[in-house]
Amino acid sequence: MRGVPTDIGVIHFVGIGGIGMSGIAEVMHNLGYQVQGSDLAEGPSVERLRGRGIQVMIGHAPENIENAAVVVTSTAVKRTNPEVASALENRIPVVRRAEMLAELMRLKSTVAVAGTHGKTTTTSMIAALLDCGDIDPTVINGGIIEQYGSNARLGDSEWMVVEADESDGSFLRLDGTIAVVTNIDPEHLDHYGDFDGVKRAFLDFIHNVPFYGAAILCIDHPEVQAVIGQVRDRRVMTYGFSLQADICGVNIRPEGGGNVFDVIVRQRGEEDRRIADVHLPMPGRHNVQNALAAIAVSIEMGCSDEVIQRGFESFGGVRRRFTKVGEVGGATIIDDYGHHPVEIAAVLGAAQEAVSSSDKGGRVIAVAQPHRYTRLRDLMDDFQSCFNDADAVYVTPVYEAGEDPIDGIDAEALVAGLKSRGHRHAATIADPQALARTLAGEIEEGDVVVCLGAGDITKWAAGLADAIAQERGA
């Protein structure tokens, strides 16, 4: 028997509306499993799952799992959750999300995409190229792929592309045939203890690749480059802007709000070749780097140079990754998930690139919502220096994500640090209404307002253009 039998009975997902859980639930439903779930509140994911024919109950209660054969949870769900507690009491198997994803992966050959940043976009780009190459993969992603209107879909081929979440170490359960590592930065230190623990986990992830697979690694990132020499018994393909890369991006030029670039391909036993004029409809060098990872995977899987040239042309991106959500008075409102200093710096760099290439000119205005007190504490120095490409910075209150406040770690401390490091325009902002009032008197045609964070800042961004217009009309 290979994988979970489809006649196992009802599989119940606790927190089914979460971005990680919903994708697995949707794919399992499409494979013929009996799937249901519960969540604390209504939302777009819940609505989408119901539209697919999946029963979703609002609220967590023991009676929700009376007919369940298996209960699936994420590490964020505590054992005291009433559904989990009832399952344990009644000896119903309780499995972690990553364990269920690993079972799904046993059904397919898999591309597993890991990294501190960029994995959601990279996963989506890989899916786009494989689609273009008629490989038709199953996809489970950590963000909504605009082309699908979902973060998951069931394909017809033997291949699956998954985002491997390193936040709690559970990605070590995911043994990819092809493993991609985009970068390794200090993150999730509450789980790993220190940065050395993070690095060890990524090395273990790479070593999980089977002997017939490959590790695809970003040579531009110093910590990833340092890992290459430690991988002695698995095949490695590197990508990046470094001239030492096997898949090397060169001749990069911003064009039409995106990028055009060439790719030099170096494969053992073959002459170097150049794939010219790859069009990527996304700004920022970091997105070109993500695209190079996708190109490396597609080359490893035998896609043609023509597929690589045209595969990104219809790529619609990923929701909350530099997503335009509004326009007011000629200024653009962008919503982005970036919440780590490296991500923030990359997104603001892309925004400056877009402004600089525009005929209108303009400024970049960052609205940042710190996510978790522990992250802000652990990376405060980095946060204080990642906003250099923003002409103005407004910092909202910290999004707690279930954490208790930490004395001296808040929006005021971040703003004070920005000012002490020479930032000319940094201030706190209390709420969406205050933000709209402030920006109504400040933004001009050509400006780009970038709302950044993994919390509810996305709601601020969604209503910001209308709120500014109302303030100006008042």
Curated annotation (Swiss-Prot):
Enzyme class label: ligase
Reaction(s) this enzyme catalyzes, per UniProt: UDP-N-acetyl-alpha-D-muramate + L-alanine + ATP = UDP-N-acetyl-alpha-D-muramoyl-L-alanine + ADP + phosphate + H(+)
Locations listed in the record: Cytoplasm
Domain of life: Bacteria
Record carries keyword Signal: no
Keyword Cytoplasm: yes
Pathway: Cell wall biogenesis; peptidoglycan biosynthesis
Residues the record lists as binding ATP: 115-121
GO cellular component: cytoplasm
GO terms (BP aspect): cell division; cell wall organization; peptidoglycan biosynthetic process; regulation of cell shape
Keyword line: ATP-binding, Cell cycle, Cell division, Cell shape, Cell wall biogenesis/degradation, Cytoplasm, Ligase, Nucleotide-binding, Peptidoglycan synthesis
Enzyme Commission (EC) number: 6.3.2.8
Entry's Gene Ontology molecular function annotations: ATP binding; UDP-N-acetylmuramate-L-alanine ligase activity
InterPro entries for this protein: Mur-like_cat_sf (IPR036565), Mur_ligase_C (IPR004101), Mur_ligase_C_dom_sf (IPR036615), Mur_ligase_cen (IPR013221), Mur_ligase_N (IPR000713), MurCDEF_pg_biosynth (IPR050061), UDP-N-AcMur_Ala_ligase_MurC (IPR005758)
Pfam assignment, any one: Mur_ligase_C
HAMAP family per UniProt: MurC
PANTHER family according to UniProt: UDP-N-ACETYLMURAMATE--L-ALANINE LIGASE (PTHR43445:SF3), UDP-N-ACETYLMURAMATE--L-ALANINE LIGASE-RELATED (PTHR43445)
Functional description taken from the UniProt entry: Cell wall formation.
Family per record: Belongs to the MurCDEF family.
UniProt protein name: UDP-N-acetylmuramate--L-alanine ligase
Lineage: Bacteria, Pseudomonadati, Pseudomonadota, Alphaproteobacteria, Sphingomonadales
